[in-house]
Each structure stands twice: as C-alpha cells, then as structure tokens.
C-alpha cells in the first residue's frame, strides 16, 4: 500500500468590527429551509442555515447584500439589514417522463484517480469546490455514475456535507445542477475515502463532461471548538473548526473555478498548478 501523507493547513482570519446578522430562511408556506447557502456579496464570508432555518452571519456593513441559494428554490439577494426573515420561492418542476434504465452493473471503471500521494486539508471557512471530469468515448460502455469517492478527514462522528453535480455550460463553466434536490452526505470520524452511492439518481456521464463538487455546511452539528493561548498576547483564543475536511492534492492543471457570492469565477492565472479536491467516480454499465 502506498503511503499517503496528510498535511494540515489552518488559515486564521483577523477580525475587525464585524456585526452579526441573525435571521431565518423559510419557504412561501412559512416552513423553515435547512442547509441554505448564504454569502455576503463579493466577499469570502458565508454560512449555512440550520435545521430550523436560522442563520448567523458576520458583516461589517449592514448595507451589504446577502445571497441565498439552494436547489429547488429561486435564488435571492437581500440587504443584510432586511434579512431577519427571508422567504424563498420554490421552483415548480414538471413531472419527469418515466424512463426505464436498462442497467446491468456488471462492469465498473474508476475515473479521476489521483497519483499524488500527498494530501492536504485546508480549513479556510465557507467553501464550495469542484473537480472536472472530462468525457472519454470509452465511457460509452459504462455511462452510468454509480458512486462518488471523496477523501475526507473528520473529528466528528457524523459530520455532513452537500454534494453537487453540474453540467458544463456553453463557456465551459459549471452550469445547471443535475440533481433536483439536495444530496446531504454523512461522513464518519477519521481520515478515509468516503463512498457515496448515487445510482438511484440515474446520472449519465455527459458528452461534455461533468463537474462534481462539495459544499461545506457551516452548521452547529459540524462545529468543533478548541482553545489555545496566543503567544503574542497571552490571551485564550477560541478557534471554530467545521468538519468534515475534504482533502486536496496538487495537480498540474492550472485552470480552476472559485465560487463567490453565488457564481463561479474562472481562475487560470496560476501557471504552476493548483490544489484540487480528491474526488473520483465509479462508472458502470
């Protein structure tokens, strides 16, 4: 077995005069919506609504816009000062035509396997990240996506994250969501390769490729606090960590995407390479 080394990178943020915005997200029937992705517009500040729809988010300007996004509902932008109660309108989906899938599941291949054995974990706050899987004609014989494997590390027994599948749009960016509802995944304690069975969704590998990614859930059930003494001030500092950590490895591909304020931004200025989440797919026939 090859040795896999894990490096930890903790990025600490300095805090200025932030004020906390508290609110709740509900649907048109006044029912709470959990796991809504919430961002401060044009800033790397985000959070997730709790099971009861409540949320807290820090901003130094109440005139800033907050962006709300979740599968199955229309996206919405609201002033921070007016976000005590945010109502999202559900999207009415037409009934899908019943399709019979003639799956055999007698053959499997794994794609996206990483060769670099040095994995890194970054705890840098709210995060949506993706990995691109290009199409190959040989996948035609194993076109169904059966499983997702994602390398994780957690200090909590039942941490959760959200998985996403995106089509490729006309500009090569992550486009429409391929699932019609959230896929919340439970991650067990420890460092491991977590397998997620997605065969019930009948996902077929698109001819333009597919983006597969995760969304970190900044909720209380995923939070672990630890205290330490600041050597400069001799004061006790409390650090909040949100699990699970998704592991990354370094790749030569310099083109990547960053999710900011509800949209994907292309990054291709790092010619040396970049870090990519360790995700692979199991395809079957």
Model-derived segments and their meaning:
Residues 94-168, 216, 220-285:
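Beta-sheet-rich sandwich/jelly-roll-like modules and their strand-loop junctions
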Residues 160-233:
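Aromatic- and Gly/Pro-enriched, solvent-exposed loop/edge beta-strand patches characteristic
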Residues 44-54:
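Short, acidic Ser/Thr/Gly-rich low-complexity loop/linker segments typical of extracellular
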Residues 67-79:
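A short, solvent-exposed loop/turn motif at the edges and junctions
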Residues 21-27, 53, 86:
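A short, amphipathic beta-strand motif
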């Amino acid at each position: 077995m090859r040795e896999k080394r894990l490096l930890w990178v903790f990025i600490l943020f300095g805090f200025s005069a932030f004020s906390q915005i508290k609110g709740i997200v509900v649907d048109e029937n006044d029912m709470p919506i959990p796991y809504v992705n919430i961002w401060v517009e044009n800033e790397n500040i985000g959070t997730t609504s709790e099971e009861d729809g409540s949320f807290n988010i820090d901003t130094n300007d109440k005139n800033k816009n907050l962006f709300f996004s979740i599968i199955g509902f229309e996206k919405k932008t609201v002033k921070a000062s007016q976000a005590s109660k945010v109502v999202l309108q559900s999207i009415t989906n037409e009934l899908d035509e019943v399709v019979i899938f003639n799956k055999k599941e007698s053959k499997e291949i794994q794609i996206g396997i990483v060769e670099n054995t040095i994995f890194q974990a970054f705890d840098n706050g709210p995060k949506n990240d993706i990995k691109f899987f290009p199409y190959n004609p040989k996948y035609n014989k194993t076109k169904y996506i059966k499983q997702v494997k994602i390398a994780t590390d957690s200090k909590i027994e039942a941490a959760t994250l959200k998985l996403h599948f995106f089509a490729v749009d006309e500009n090569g960016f992550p486009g429409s969501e391929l699932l019609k509802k959230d896929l919340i995944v439970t991650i067990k304690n420890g460092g491991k390769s977590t397998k997620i069975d997605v065969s019930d969704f009948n996902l077929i590998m698109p001819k333009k490729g597919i983006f597969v990614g995760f969304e970190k859930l900044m909720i209380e059930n995923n939070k672990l606090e630890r205290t330490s003494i600041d050597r400069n001030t001799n004061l006790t500092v409390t650090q909040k960590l949100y699990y699970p950590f998704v592991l990354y490895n370094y790749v030569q591909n310099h083109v990547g995407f960053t999710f900011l304020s509800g949209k994907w931004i292309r990054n291709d200025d790092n010619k040396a390479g970049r870090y990519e989440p360790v995700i692979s797919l199991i395809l079957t026939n």
